[in-house]
C-alpha cells in the first residue's frame, strides 16, 4: 500500500513526504507498537522478576506518544495552520526524540536483563530505573515540544537545509548521532545476549533496521524522496 500510494502521489518540490503516505505509515507503526507494549506488559505481569520487560514496554509506550503528536502535527499542515517547512522541522524534532527515547529505554532494559542473567546487583535500583524510564516517556515529548516551532526562542533546526531541488533536508549530524546510538545498542546487545533469547532477538532486529532506515535518511538530499518510503517501509516491516 505504501509503494502504490507513493507511486500515485508524487510530491512537488515544496513537500518531502506525501501526507497520505505519512499518515498510513504512522498508523501502521502505531498499531505495531501498541501490540508490542501490551505484549511486554503481559509478559512482565506473568513474571515480575523480569523487570527488563517492564522497561521494554515503556520504550514502546514512548513511541505511541510521539506517533500521536506527529499525527496532530500533520493535521496542522492539512488545515493550513503551519507552513510545510515548519511542519517538516517539527516532525524531524519529534522523530529525533522518539529514536533517542526508544534507544535509551531499550538500553536500560538491556542493563536490567544483564543483571538478571548474572544475578549481580544492578547499577540502578528498580525504582530509579522506573523513574528514569518515565522521564524519557513523558519528559522527552515535553522537551521536544519546547524545542519545536511553539517556542521560537528555543527552536531546534534539524530539517532546515534546502537541496538543489528545493526540498528541505535534514542535517546529517543529527542522523549520524542516531545511527551511532543504534549501532552501539546493536553491538552491546549482541555481545551480552547473542541470539539466545527470543525477545532480544527482536531487539537485535529493531536496532539493525533502525541503522538501515536512519542511514537512508542521509541520502534524502541526494536522491528522490522514494528513499523516505523505503526507510519507513523497513521500519514497519
Name each region found by the language model.
Residues 63-71, 139-143, 208-218:
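Hydrophobic alpha-helical transmembrane segments and adjacent interfacial helices
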Residues 3-15, 72-83, 143-161, 214-223:
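Juxtamembrane "helix-exit" motif on the non-cytosolic side of transmembrane helices
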Residues 42-49, 110-126, 188-195:
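Cytoplasmic membrane-interface regions of multi-pass membrane proteins
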Amino acid at each position: 500500500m505504501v509503494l502504490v500510494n507513493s507511486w500515485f502521489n508524487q510530491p512537488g518540490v515544496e513537500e518531502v513526504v506525501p501526507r497520505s503516505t505519512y499518515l498510513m505509515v504512522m498508523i501502521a507503526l502505531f498499531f505495531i507498537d501498541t501490540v508490542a507494549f501490551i505484549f511486554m506488559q503481559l509478559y512482565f505481569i506473568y513474571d515480575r522478576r523480569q523487570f527488563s520487560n517492564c522497561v521494554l514496554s515503556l520504550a514502546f509506550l514512548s513511541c505511541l506518544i510521539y506517533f500521536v503528536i506527529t499525527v496532530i502535527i500533520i493535521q496542522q499542515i492539512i488545515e493550513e495552520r503551519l507552513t510545510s517547512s515548519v511542519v517538516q522541522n517539527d516532525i524531524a524534532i519529534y522523530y529525533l526524540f522518539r529514536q533517542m527515547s526508544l534507544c535509551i529505554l531499550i538500553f536500560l532494559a538491556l542493563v536490567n536483563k544483564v543483571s538478571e542473567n548474572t544475578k549481580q546487583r544492578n547499577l540502578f535500583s528498580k525504582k530509579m530505573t522506573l523513574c528514569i524510564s518515565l522521564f524519557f516517556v513523558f519528559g522527552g515529548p515535553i522537551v521536544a515540544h519546547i524545542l519545536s516551532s511553539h517556542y521560537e526562542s528555543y527552536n531546534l533546526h534539524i530539517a532546515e537545509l534546502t537541496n538543489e531541488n528545493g526540498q528541505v533536508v535534514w542535517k546529517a549530524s543529527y542522523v549520524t548521532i542516531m545511527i551511532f546510538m543504534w549501532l552501539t545498542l546493536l553491538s552491546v546487545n549482541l555481545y551480552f545476549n547473542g541470539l539466545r533469547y527470543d525477545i532480544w532477538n527482536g531487539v537485535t532486529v529493531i536496532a539493525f533496521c533502525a541503522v538501515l532506515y536512519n542511514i537512508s535518511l542521509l541520502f534524502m538530499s541526494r536522491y528522490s524522496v522514494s528513499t523516505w518510503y523505503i526507510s519507513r517501509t523497513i521500519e514497519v516491516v
